[in-house]
Amino acid sequence: MKAEDVRALSPDQLADELLKLKKEQFNLRFQKATGQLENTARSKQIRRDIARIKTVQTDKRTGAPVQKAK
């Protein structure tokens, strides 16, 4: 998920998406522990998406200006 897509979401949608990603991260952690995880890159992707969502939530809460990527 790109940062501009995350910024377009409402605060409620951000919270829902964060909850969904945390559940998926939890399931992937168990798959890794039991040796059933096939796509190991997905855990890194989810971790970064969670960080993006948390960053956007903080920006919206504090009213920080949005900077576009160069």
Swiss-Prot record:
GO CC aspect terms: cytosolic large ribosomal subunit
Gene Ontology MF terms: structural constituent of ribosome
Entry keyword set: Ribonucleoprotein, Ribosomal protein
UniProt entry tagged with the keyword DNA damage: no
Pfam families: Ribosomal_L29
GO biological process terms on file: translation
InterPro entries assigned to the protein according to its UniProt record, in alphabetical order: Ribosomal_protein_uL29, Ribosomal_uL29, Ribosomal_uL29_sf
HAMAP family referenced in this protein's UniProt entry, alphabetically: Ribosomal_uL29
Protein known as: Large ribosomal subunit protein uL29
Species this chain originates from: Xanthobacter autotrophicus (strain ATCC BAA-1158 / Py2)
Name of the gene this protein is made from: rpmC
